[in-house]
């Protein structure tokens, strides 16, 4: 099967509640309007959106061996995403986030790291993973085994094969620029948020 895009990186389960004005004190209960489960992450959310737009997508990432993984994989398949390169890892949970969505749209997050920290790509998988013409890497900063030199080598190999490369991270801090700057020569399109761009560049505008 030929794919339009390979979407590599962070696949997580998001639990969204809205609107959340405050966490109730003690063991009290606060009623909200909606709770939803979604596939998220700067790879997971991206691949779902691309599939909705009609692209033939290959998902490349890792989930755990739990009920959260069942939901992530079933949802990807429901949208027609090829999950043949998704790794299901025993002994670790699927990475997941609780998002308390405020009325103004702010989304403070509680994240539990999991399978994405153990995700890596074997050399034997490169032909399949890098076969599509577009390669997206998303989630740098929360991909412990893939971050740094493995990501640089992956993107360099993608460019050596003539692929278009796109890149997104997840959050930014004082160490982010050092982490991602070796990747820049191998990235065609980098898509940080405004907040991430300010943090990385040190610019106010």
Residue map of PLM features:
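Short, glycine-/polar-rich solvent-exposed loops and beta-turns at beta-strand/coil boundaries
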Residues: 90-92
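Glycine-rich phosphate/adenosyl-contacting loop at the front of the ribokinase-like
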Residues: 1-62, 67-81
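Short Asp/Glu-rich motifs
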Residues: 69-70, 95-96, 177-178
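Ribokinase/PfkB-type carbohydrate-kinase core domain
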Residues: 1-12, 74-88, 101-205
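Short beta-strand scaffold segments in enzyme catalytic cores
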Residues: 48, 96-100, 108
């Amino acid at each position: 099967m030929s794919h339009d895009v390979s979407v590599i990186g962070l696949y997580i389960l998001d639990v969204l509640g809205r609107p959340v004005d405050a966490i109730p004190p003690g063991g009290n209960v606060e009623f909200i309007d909606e709770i939803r489960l979604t596939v998220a992450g700067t790879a997971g959310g991206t691949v779902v959106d691309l599939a909705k737009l009609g692209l033939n997508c290959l998902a490349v990432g890792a989930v755990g061996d739990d009920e959260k993984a069942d939901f992530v994989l079933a949802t990807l398949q429901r949208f027609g995403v090829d999950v043949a390169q998704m790794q299901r890892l025993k002994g670790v949970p699927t990475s997941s986030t609780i998002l308390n969505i405020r009325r103004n749209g702010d989304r403070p997050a509680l994240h539990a790291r999991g399978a994405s920290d153990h995700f890596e790509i074997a050399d034997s998988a490169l032909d399949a993973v890098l076969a599509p013409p577009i390669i997206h890497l998303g989630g740098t900063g929360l991909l412990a085994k893939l971050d740094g030199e493995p990501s640089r080598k992956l993107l360099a190999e993608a460019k050596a094969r003539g692929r278009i490369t796109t890149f997104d991270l997840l959050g930014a801090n004082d160490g982010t620029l050092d982490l991602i700057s070796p990747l820049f020569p191998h990235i065609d399109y980098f898509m940080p948020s405004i907040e991430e761009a300010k943090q990385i560049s040190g610019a106010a505008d």
